[in-house]
């Protein structure tokens, strides 16, 4: 019944596309008038559009004409004219939706339409890609169109200076990677002035490969962190013990990806820990004094039995590097959290880095929800349409192809064992190679790609291997995978974003000839050669894509298939499976094994059965649902932190922007004074119950007030009188500092103290939340909802953090005993910059800042200690010396140079 209705009325997607096609006629009707414009007149359209917007027009009012202008500019500058289906893609993106467009349909060119239109507002547009290569490539190629029309273009890649980034972000259109955008957002919110920040307020983002960024990478938050205590020796000791365990000591569940010690395992590991002197005799692993070791043992177990080298990570140049399970790429700068990375380093016998403490973090889910408008493009997102709608409120619209898809998708072939499967794959590769048909073989891991490469080497079949180990050549290798007789092995979607053209990619080959004297002649030669090769490849049947396993996600399988048959080219795809494959073994083996027994499968024989295909699809749906739940759960927890993060970041920005810090100081002083007085002189209490001694101590600790006991003994004095007196005394202390150093200088110093104190308590709060998060799931055993418990406790911790902020801030301000008479305003600004430089530029990679996680507020205040007049220095009081040059005589009077005396330490 449903299928009949679909045929009659079409799907919701069909109806949306039909509506959009009616708008395309309006754009096309403007083409003749736009086409006859001179270059100068065409460029001037940008000025006209901006003027219209200034006078109250909306983007939708100028949409059709703007799209027609971009189409004509692209035709003149790049020789590429937007097809009607590309205009549809542009409309979808402008309206804040996701355009699903097949591989080779020109998504990069599509983005120019909404990017140009939305950049006319002057608020900036971010075009987001998955790696630096694509960001550089797209900004260079599409930037010609924007520049022709008078718009500026920027490109953000790793390693740029803040000044260069600031210029790029202030461009009308900025191409950047998702990682750099996220890290720059976090870094900006660790800076000390608005001038040092690089990002503008969020406006509009167009995400290329949107499924990869918003779904595949959503489970991994981006983190700026700093090292904490060095526990590398303990990781090494635990690793040696874990190696001695056998299979009966633990049980693992591959479906749930969990591993736990058995009772026997606990007994064995306790005896080994006692033997090595790690725990005391007669104590157990789960005794209170040893509970911290459970974490190390669990992570070492996971490292050895749940993570596989060249599948989940690789070892390069003495470092453990994470492999993205979806793309096969190395995730530069990423480290597993909670000690897992250290456990892997111990397992692989490489240098163990310190554990990290989070200084700032955010998930891509919450980062991209900051944008006023968000849209994206991908070749495959319909399978995740509900998730994109639920989490990001993004609708997915499938755009028709410009040319009909002629690719043939063959049925899966299922074999009894991995060896039989490889034999069948080898036979097909040999057949294709002999007739010259290019082949792309997709694997799910580096390990599998190297295994297959080894088989082809033995058979003397020339081929290229594309995986995380060779990512530098990624774009070039994948671009030439469509050449005559080419055999390419690629992990998953490595090289995604680069088209595979039949006969080869002329632009990539020409790029290598830039420095050749015979550049022009060779360019023509290459184009002719590729045109000839393309015809030969078409005659062989086009690109043949072979999948060696089904991925957990149907979308990844579809992406692999989509490599073949671009823009109406011929091609074939086929998956080869075996009962040894992870997906089959873990999720579908029982059901499929029963079918195979019924059919009586013989050695080396393949089967094609609808029930097996259905079973595989159900298994994939099950895994997809599980992964979706994980991402949704991560978001639920991160939303708690995100609410707090927004408050802190907004507060921090207000502090930086404010010209007067006295308001916050004044209100906080009054609040703390009232709180302290009422603590030791409770309302309604008798005078003899007042704790004046401790009140005196506390007032000196917080405000540096020397409180006179006799003031309390006056007749008729009340708690309110004492509170007012304390507030006045605190104000007098501040006023005396202001008179000594100038109000402007004190205002800058107070702002600096407030910012550094806020950073300190926020960092400590994140540490507390990390610990709370790690153990919160155990509340489920007490019939409590972990999320509700996390929300409640996180709120309590946040309140506690705000109280700590106020106390630490006030205490630091009122205990200023530094001689600031010679301190200039620009000196504080300079010290801000130095501190920020140390925070951001000393990191090893974007996710691992060496910003000292252990610094106290006193450490942060060191930069304020600058020049002091030598005659004001007291020999027996180093605090009065201020900054001393290393080659000056030491102020203590020893006669030695400062660097050899008190400065030696």
Curated annotation (Swiss-Prot):
- Kindly state which keywords UniProt assigns to this record, in alphabetical order: ATP-binding, Cell inner membrane, Cell membrane, Cytoplasm, Membrane, Metal-binding, Nucleotide-binding, Protein transport, Translocase, Translocation, Transport, Zinc
The record's comment on cofactor binding reads: May bind 1 zinc ion per subunit.
UniProt: Zn(2+) binding residues: 890, 892, 901-902
Enzyme Commission identifier(s): 7.4.2.8
Question: Would the keyword Ubl conjugation be found if you checked this record's keyword annotation?
Answer: no
- Self-association or partners: how does it assemble? Monomer and homodimer. Part of the essential Sec protein translocation apparatus which comprises SecA, SecYEG and auxiliary proteins SecDF-YajC and YidC.
Could you tell me which NCBIfam families the record lists for this protein?
Answer: PRK12904.1, secA
| Family (UniProt) | Belongs to the SecA family.
* Stated name of the protein: Protein translocase subunit SecA
Q: Which organism is it from?
A: Rickettsia typhi (strain ATCC VR-144 / Wilmington)
Encoding gene (name): secA
């Amino acid at each position: 019944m449903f299928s009949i209705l679909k045929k009659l009325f079409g799907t919701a997607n069909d109806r949306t596309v039909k509506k959009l096609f009616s708008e395309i006629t309006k754009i096309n009707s403007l083409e003749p008038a736009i086409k006859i414009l001179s270059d100068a007149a065409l460029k001037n359209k940008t000025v006209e559009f901006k003027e219209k917007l200034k006078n109250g027009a909306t983007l939708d009012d100028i949409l059709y004409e703007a799209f027609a202008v971009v189409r004509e500019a692209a035709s003149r500058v790049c020789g590429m004219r937007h097809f009607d289906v590309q205009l549809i893609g542009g409309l979808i993106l402008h309206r804040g939706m996701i355009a699903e467009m097949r591989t080779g349909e020109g998504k990069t060119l599509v983005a120019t339409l909404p990017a140009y239109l939305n950049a006319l507002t002057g608020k900036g547009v971010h075009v987001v890609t998955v790696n630096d290569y694509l960001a550089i490539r797209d900004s260079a190629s599409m930037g010609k169109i924007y520049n022709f029309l008078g718009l500026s273009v920027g490109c953000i890649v790793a390693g740029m200076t803040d000044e260069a980034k600031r210029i790029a972000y202030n461009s009308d259109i900025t191409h950047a990677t998702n990682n750099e955008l996220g890290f720059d957002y976090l870094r900006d919110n660790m800076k000390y002035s608005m001038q040092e920040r690089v990002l503008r307020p969020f406006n509009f983002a167009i995400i290329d490969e949107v499924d990869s960024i918003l779904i595949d990478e959503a489970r991994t938050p981006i983190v700026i962190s700093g090292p904490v205590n060095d526990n590398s020796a303990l990781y090494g000791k635990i690793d040696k013990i874990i190696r001695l365990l056998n299979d009966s000591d633990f049980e693992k569940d591959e479906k749930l990806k969990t591993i736990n010690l058995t009772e026997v395992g606990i007994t064995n590991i306790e005896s080994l820990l006692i033997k090595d002197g790690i725990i005391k005799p007669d104590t157990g692993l789960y005794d209170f004094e040893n509970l911290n070791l459970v974490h190390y043992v669990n992570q070492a177990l996971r490292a050895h039995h749940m993570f596989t080298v060249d599948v989940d990570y690789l070892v390069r140049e003495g470092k453990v590097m994470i492999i993205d399970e979806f793309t096969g790429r190395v995730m530069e700068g990423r480290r597993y959290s909670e000690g897992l990375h250290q456990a892997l380093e111990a397992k692989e016998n490489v240098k163990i880095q310190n554990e990290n403490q989070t200084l700032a973090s955010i998930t891509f889910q919450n980062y991209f929800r900051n944008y006023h408008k968000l849209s994206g493009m991908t070749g495959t997102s319909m399978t995740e349409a509900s998730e994109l709608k639920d989490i990001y409120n993004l609708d997915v619209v499938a755009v028709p192809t410009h040319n009909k898809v002629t690719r043939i998708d063959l049925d899966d072939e299922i074999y009894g064992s991995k060896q039989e499967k490889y034999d069948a794959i080898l036979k097909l590769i040999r057949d294709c190679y002999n007739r010259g048909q290019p082949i792309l073989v997709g694997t799910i891991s580096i390990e599998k790609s190297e295994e297959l490469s080894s088989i082809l080497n033995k058979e003397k079949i020339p081929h290229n291997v594309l995986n995380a180990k060779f990512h530098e050549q990624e774009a070039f290798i994948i671009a030439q995978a469509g050449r005559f007789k080419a055999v390419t092995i690629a992990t998953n979607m490595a090289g995604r974003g680069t088209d595979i053209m039949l006969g080869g990619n002329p632009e990539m080959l020409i790029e290598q000839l830039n420095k050749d004297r015979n550049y022009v002649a060779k360019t023509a030669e290459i184009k002719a050669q590729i045109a000839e090769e393309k015809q030969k490849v078409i005659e062989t049947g086009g690109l043949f894509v072979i999948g060696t396993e089904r991925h957990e996600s149907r979308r990844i399988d579809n992406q692999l298939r989509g490599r073949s048959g671009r823009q109406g080219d011929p091609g074939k795809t086929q998956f080869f499976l075996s009962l040894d494959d992870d997906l089959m073994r873990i999720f579908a083996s029982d059901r499929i094994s029963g079918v195979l027994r019924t059919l009586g499968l013989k050695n080396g024989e393949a089967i094609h059965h609808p029930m097996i295909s259905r079973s595989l699809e159900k298994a994939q749906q099950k895994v997809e649902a599980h992964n979706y739940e994980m991402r949704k759960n991560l978001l639920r927890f991160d939303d708690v932190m995100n609410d707090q993060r927004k408050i802190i970041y907004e507060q921090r920005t207000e502090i930086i922007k404010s010209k007067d810090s006295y308001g916050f100081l004044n209100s906080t002083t009054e609040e703390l004074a009232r709180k302290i007085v009422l603590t030791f002189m409770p309302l309604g209490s008798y005078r003899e119950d007042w704790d004046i001694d401790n009140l005196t101590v506390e007032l000196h600790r917080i405000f540096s007030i020397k409180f006179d006991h006799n003031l309390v003994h006056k007749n008729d004095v009340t708690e309110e009188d004492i509170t007012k007196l304390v507030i006045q005394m605190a104000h007098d202390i501040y006023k005396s500092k202001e008179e000594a150093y100038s109000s402007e200088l004190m205002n800058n110093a107070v702002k600096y103290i407030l910012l550094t104190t806020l950073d300190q308590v926020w960092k400590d709060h994140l540490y507390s939340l990390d610990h709370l998060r790690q153990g919160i799931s155990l509340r489920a055993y007490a019939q409590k909802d972990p999320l509700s418990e996390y929300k409640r406790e996180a709120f309590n911790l946040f309140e506690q953090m705000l109280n700590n902020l106020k106390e630490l801030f006030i205490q630091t301000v009122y205990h200023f005993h530094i001689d600031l008479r010679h301190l200039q305003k620009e000196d504080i600004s300079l010290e801000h910059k130095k501190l920020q430089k140390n925070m951001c530029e000393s990191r090893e990679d974007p996710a691992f800042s060496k910003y000292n996680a252990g610094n106290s507020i006193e450490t942060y205040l060191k930069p304020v200690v600058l020049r002091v007049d030598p005659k004001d220095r007291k020999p027996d009081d180093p605090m009065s010396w201020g900054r001393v040059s290393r080659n000056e005589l030491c102020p203590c009077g020893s006669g030695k140079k400062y660097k050899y005396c008190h400065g030696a330490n």
